[in-house]
Structure formats: structure tokens, C-alpha cells
Amino acid sequence: MRYALSAAIAAALAPGAVLAQDAQPAAAAAADSATTLDAVVVSGTARFKGVRKRDASFSITTASAEQLQEAVPLSTADALKVVPGVWAESAGGSTGANIFVRGMPSEGDAPFVTVQMDGAPLFPPPTLSFLENSTLFRMDDTIERMEVLRGGPSPIFSNGQPGATVNFIQKKGGEEPAGSLRLGLGSDGFRRVDLFNSGKLGEGWYYSVGGFYRSTDGVRDTQFPADKGGQLSATLTHSWDAGEITVYARHTDDKNAFFTPIPLLSRDNGSSLSSFPGLNAQTGTLLGNDFRHVTIPTGRGTSISRDLADGRGINLDVFGASMDFYVGDWTISDRVNFVTGSAPTNGLFTGASPQTLSSFIAGYGSAGTATYVNGGGAVDPNQQVLTAGFWVVDKEIESFTNDLRFSKDLFEGNTLTAGVYFAKYSSKDTWYLGNNMLLTAQNNARRINLTLADGRQVTRDGFTGTSFFSLRGDYDGQNTAVFLADEWQVNERLRLDGGIRYEWQQVDGTVHDTATVDLDGNPNTLYDNATSISLPSSRRIDQDDKHFSWTLGANYKLTDNASVFARANSGYKLPAFDNLRDGNTKVQEIDQYELGFKSGAQSYDLYLTAFYNKFTNSPFQAFLQDGTNFTTVGDSRAYGVEVEGAWRPVGGLELALTGVWLDAKYENYREFTGNQVMRQPKQQFRFTPSYYWTLPFGDLKVFATYSRIGDRYADLANTQKLPSYHTLDVGANLHVGEHWEFAATGSNVSNELGLTEGNVRVPGAATGGVFMGRPIAGRSYLFSAAYKW
């Protein structure tokens, strides 16, 4: 599927979905709360006008733009740390996160997280290999708020996501001109400018435009810009008595370095970690200029050139529209978008733990001579070395989605909604995995050339190998779903809702065959003796799936300030491109149950949610260091309790807490049955005290967040234990008069060493006290000054 420009223009002008709340003045931020029961949410509701959180029979977290800033997020995925029940591993950088929801099993990426903009998914499959939804989105000052729905009725709406739906709602123009110019500076060469402007064009016509540009060297010294790029967005809104339509466009061009596990020292059965000599865990990285620009052979006489600084960036265009209007007794809502662009991965993927150079050479059964690729000179035999691969994944993606809904009041208090969801999407993939290099195990590693005494050449420009897994694939998918939902306010206290959905999916594609060859025909050049190449011949992927989902919910008001809710749903996850390529053709089936309590008043807000989910046919896939594509399938179950609350005992003091306790286990999963679901902590919580002052010239808010992440396992076998850790973030917001805003934040100010990932490519525990893990970034600070009008 390749759409012409005319299709993009049509998508931008077509009708689409959500009526959002107006942005609130910054000075009112202290009165805002992510758990305010009177807030109106539009995510997970059948009708465009939404529902108050106190009346909702599902779990949803909201955060305003200022609350997101106070969370000190390092990326889009990192912003999800404010959501209980969600665990986002964002130590890989600004993109390429692994996000997990309520114990739902996956090996990584974010198959159970859909990111929406104004109610439309950015890409219908929430995850493909080397691409998850949060990578496609950048937060800036054009965003009004974030809503995160967990479970609930989401299996029947939009793309049927059974996990978490993250909806970013854009600011729109209003009657009065409004905007801001924000300049940001920070540690590690951070520089950023954000611009937003909005206003009225004419009677009933409104506009907004904004974007950002940012460059930073990063907390980890890569010797090149770790993040560099920006985006530009615009909306045009027309309102009339019977409705409103908004069209929008967004272009993002951003490059982001990607970080994978590095060697660390592990003691006391993994409970104590420290930096590997020569490689600082908080600020160090193997990445550097020595192998930033490389040429990789892809076949006999063919090669590609790549820049490590391109990382896991995007060059993406989004065109969309939302429309809500009345026709007689009917309400019609539509969400539509068209997305096109590229999302490459150029990253260094590590494998086994370091060893001395002499030990590495001895593994070939011969003596040898080792020199640096750049600068020459002999390498000390005692130098610690490792092999790591320069993996290249090129993805060209395209999608069109449309979510059309018709609602009608059947009788007083009862509204029926019927809808159709349609998505057509494609991905064109070219992969070169492997390309291992012999590197020094130190900050900004250096490549090593190695020649054995018996004449064998181990490396070429430091490369010990070529691609062990090459892939050329071209995939197309189409999903059509019909759904029916009913909302019934039975009386003043009881509200019921339910819905059903039936979906058809058609996926087809072409995957080229591969062969393993010796590129130069010389057995003594070891570096290219086993090169995976793509062949002209190919095999077809062609599968149709159909499935049914349902949901039932109830909310009962106990008092004016408290209510309880219950929810049951049965959903599914249809196999995506990569699943079908690897032969995982089964539909995942998910049953979920929730029981919740909500209460709130001027002095407090409280949400408690108990949940249970059960999975069948859950696949696992990982590329191991030796090139093996390991796959298996099984079941799981998880239950837990989420808490989200705030207490305001006196004056401007607020004490906020979010957290989750989780018990998730594998079932019917080969030898892994009974193990803890990998990569997800049993406990995590965030405690945020803050204080707000009203000053003669404005207002000031200071805050801090203490976060604790519990033990996890990095692998299915539960042999790589990742110890618990904690972090401390701090910040302050100062508003001066009506126009000026100043903010200062610090992330991980105590410079803690915590791991978000082990090395799934090398199953097993630490070897000789050395462990491969991906640590969180060290401390960093940001300062911004904004002028608002």
C-alpha cells in the first residue's frame, strides 16, 4: 500500500473525532490534580462529549501540560511513569522504549500500548519489531493534556487495544489570541525552543500552530548529538451551532541515539551493582565517533553506509481531522488520520560480557596481532574487549485510520452508539542484524583489528562478522471492525455501560528468502564467511482473522464524593506482521476484570483499582547473540492493585502517591511455567510532595518525586535478576505576572544506578561478576523560561 499525495490531502480534510477541554491558565495549576473527579475525559467513551471521571466505570489517568512537565519526563514513554500499572523502560534514550501494562506478557517494545493523537491511533498495530507507538510521538507545547485508559472498554473501541490507550489531545485556537515562546537550557549541552500561537481567524474559524527544535549531547557522552531535530504542527477549527470540525497536520524530523545494555559489575547475587572499570554506568556509553560512520557489506559487491547518530529517529508526517456534530436526534463523531514516513534503527546491540583481548584471541586456537582501527598502535593483551553489533533496520510505514460513530438517545438516560473502525496500513522493512565489531570495553569504545599468526584475518575495519540475519519484507494489513455500545444512567446513583465488537483482519506480505554465503570465497577472511543475504525469491504471508470482544461496566455512587465501579471485558490481540513472519499465527485472547473505588473532595483524591487478567496464546520472540530467532508461545495470568491519590492537608501542601502491586506468572509456558512475567516489577510507586505559594507578583510551586522500582527478571527463565532501585527528581515552577513562567527541574539528582533491562540476547546470569544491563541515565538538569500571551 502506497498512498499518493491526494490521499493525504483527503485524509486531512476528512471528518474525525474529539472535543477537548480548553487549556487552563498556568496560574491555576496548583488547583489541578491528575485525580480530580470532576475532570471530563474523552478516551474510552462512546460519545464525543466524554464523561466525568467520577462517573466512569474504568481506570483512567489524566495529566495536564504542566503536570507532565513536573513529572520530568525524558521521553514520551517516560511520561507514562505517572500512570499506575504501567512500567516504561526508557533508559534506551528518547525512543525505542519497552512499555508494559498490568503484567501483560511481552518480550519488549509495547504491544499493549496504543498512542493516539486527538483520539486516532498513530499507527494501528501498536508494535512491530523495532517500532512501538511512543517512538512516533514527540511532546511539545502544542499538547493540552494526556489521558491514559487502562483496560476498561478499550477492547471494543478504535484499534481494540486491551492494554493501555494513551491519548494526547492538542491545543486548539479560541476566541482570544493565546500562545507561548519557551527557551530551554540544560546540562549536557541541552538546548530547546518551543513556540505555540493560536487565535481567531474569523467568525467560527480558529487556528493554532506550534512546534519545537531541540539539540543535546545527552547524559551519556556519545561524542555526537544524542538528540537532534524538531517538529511543526498546525490545526484549523471551524465551529457552528450544530458541531465542530478540526483538521490538523504535523511533521516530525528527529534523530535519537539508542542505548542498549553495557557491562556492569554485579555482587551479592545481583543485589549490588557498580560501574565496569573504564565505563561509567551513569554517564558512559560504548557509542562514539570511532564507529559513528560505517560501511556494511550486504552482498557480493554491495554495501550500505550508516550513521550511528541517526539512532531510532523518525521522519514522519501526520494529517488528521476530528468532527463532532448533531443531525436531528443523532450525534455523529469521526476520527481520521493518515500517517506516512520512516522509522529507522541504527544501534549498537551488545552480546556477551567482556573478556581480556588475550582470552579472546586464545579462543581461535592461535596467537595474533591486534591494532586499533583508527590511530593504529598495538592493543594491550590485558585490555578488556567485547563484541557488539551495528544493527540496521529500515522501516517505511504508512497508515490510514477512520473511527466513525453514530449516537442516539433511546430514552431518558440511555444512549446507544454504533460505530465502524477501518484501518489500512503497511510496513516496508529492510534489516541487517549482526555486523559484530571487536571493541574495547570502555567509554566511547574503539574498534580493533585482529590478525592471527596462522594467517587468518579475524576482522575487517574492526568487524568480526557481517549480517547474521538479513530481511527484506513488504507487508500490508487491513482491519475492519463494527461495534455497538450502550450507556445507561439508570438513576442518580447507578450507571451501566456495555458493548460488543466484531473485527476482520487481512494481512498479506512478501518476505524474501535468504542464504548464508562466504562473500569473498576466502575461508581465511573469517569476518565474511557466514553472511546472510536476501535472495530475489520470496515467500508469501497471507492470513485472515476474525474475532469478537465485549465489555460490561457499572458505576455506583455511594455518596456525592465516592463511588465504586466494576468492569469485565474479553479482548484479543491479532497477529501482526512479525508474528506471522515467524509462524506465530494464533490470536492472543485476553480476559480482564476490574473492581475500583473513587473518592474525592477539596482536601483529597483517591483511586483504588484491583485487576485480574488472563492471557492465552502469548508469543515470545528474541534474536539471540548467535543469530538464533528464538520463539515460543504460552499463557499467563496477573492480578494486582493500583493506587492513585493526593492529600492536601493544609494551605498549598499536596502529598501525591501512585503505585501498583503486581503478581504476574507464566502458565503452560514450557519450562518457564510458574516464573514471574519478565521485565515487570512486583511493586513500584511514586511519592510526590509539593507546595504552592501565592506571591505578590505571581505564584511558586516546588516539588519532588521519590520513585521506587521493585525487583524484576530480565528473561523468561528468571535467571537474570534486576535489583530494585529508587530515584529522586526535583523541580520548581515560578509564574511572574500574567505572562512569564520559569521552570527548573532535575532528574535522578541522587545519581542512582538502576537497571531497566538485562540482556535478553544472552540468556543466563552474570558471568564472573560481570553483568550486561541497561542502566538509567545519571543526573541531569533543565531550565526553561517562557513568555505567554
Where are these regions (language model features)?
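Transmembrane beta-barrel wall of Gram-negative outer-membrane proteins
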Residues: 178-180, 184-216, 220-289, 311-326, ...
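Extracytoplasmic beta-strand/coil segments of soluble accessory domains associated
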Residues: 26, 45, 49, 77-121
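Acidic/polar loop-and-plug regions of large Gram-negative outer-membrane beta-barrel proteins
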Residues: 237-239, 244-318, 347-391, 445-475, ...
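Structural signature of Gram-negative outer-membrane beta-barrels, strongest in the C-terminal barrel
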Residues: 397-399, 409, 413-425, 467, ...
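Gram-negative outer-membrane beta-barrel transporters
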Residues: 22-23, 605, 612-614, 631-717, ...
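Short acidic/polar hinge/loop motifs at secondary-structure boundaries
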Residues: 121-150
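N-terminal periplasmic accessory domains that precede
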Residues: 76-79, 98-103, 113-116, 133-136, ...
